[in-house]
Every structure is written in C-alpha cells, then in structure tokens.
Amino acid sequence: MIDKPKLMAHLRTIPDYPVKGIVFFDVTTLFKDAECLKMLVDDLYEHYKDKGITKVVGVESRGYIAGAALALRLGAGFIMARKPGKLPAEKLSESYSKEYGTDSIEIHADAIDENDVVLIHDDLLATGGTVAATYRLVKRFNPKTVYMSFNIALDDVPKLDIYPRDAETYSILHLTEHDA
C-alpha cells in the first residue's frame, strides 16, 4: 500500500536544475529510506506479478534501483539501458530529445529475445523522450509485450509526440510541478 504523504515527505525537489526553469524531482532521497524503497518495489510487484515479465529494462541510472529489485522479486532478468559508450559488447542504440538537450540510449544486442515480456522501468516520466527512445529500442528486439513503469509521472508536463501512448503504462505517484 502506498503512503503518498510519506513518499512526498522523502522526495527532494530542486528548482532550476539542471537548467533554469526545470524542477528536478530527486528520487535518491526515496531510495535511501528503506521503507520508501520497499513501498515502491512492493507496489510495482503487486501491479506486475501476473503479467509474465521475463526481463526488466532499467533506464540509466535511477531506473536501475527499483528496476533491479523488481526483477529479482519477479524472477526476471535485468537489462541496463545505458548512455553511449558504457556497454562493452555489441549494442543497439536509439537517440532522443529531452527537456534540456539530446542524448542516446544503448542496450546490448543479445539482451532481449522474441519470447520475452519486457517491462521498461524509469524513475520519472516528464516529456517521455528517454522512455520513448528506450521503448523504440526494445521494440527492435520484437518481444511479445512491452510495458512501462515509473516511480513518478509528472502529469502537467506535455508529452512529446514520440511518446508511446499505445504501451500499457503504470506510475506509482502522479504529480505536477506544483507539488515541488
């Protein structure tokens, strides 16, 4: 069961970071509290335990924490979606735009197969640029199904046209920038 007031009390917000006009929701303060971290992972587990997830893709880097813990609970493999140049073997790459610049994301070329049911997990959904690129990248592997989950969704931030609205998405907390 989610205790939103407890999570909100542990969520740090930083105005004008990384650039002026952006409110940064720092989930690391949720992860350092054992009860908050357990609450997040337990909630995600309850939502996905019957979906047949075989791989969880954590998006660099804050998607790794709850994503890896959730993969362990689900009995699924864990895949790291990384920034360029961090993976040592053959990889696939996808570029994207975000609120304050452009980047790309990579996954090892042998990470996912067509029999997998994949859950992409990231800490926060803002414009959807990062997860859209990760979704496109995962879809290139032709898995059976792709789900997406987030610790936090910023509902008042407009999603980019490239955001995959056809994918089943779950967010634990729905916030606005006014919640900062």
What is each of the regions a protein language model found here?
Residues 132-180:
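PRPP-dependent phosphoribosyltransferase catalytic core
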Residues 65-74, 133-135:
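Short Gly/Thr/Asp-enriched flexible loops that form oxyanion-binding sites at enzyme active sites
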Residues 58, 120-121:
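Generic enzyme active-site microenvironment
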Residues 77-119:
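Short, glycine/charge-rich flexible loops or terminal/linker lids adjacent to PRPP-binding catalytic cores
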Residues 123, 128:
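Conserved G/P- and acidic residue-centered "switch" motifs that form tight phosphate/ATP-binding loops
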Residues 1-53:
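Active-site-facing substrate-recognition patch
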Residues 53-60:
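Short glycine-rich phosphate-binding loop at a beta-alpha junction
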Residues 54, 116, 146:
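Conserved acidic residues
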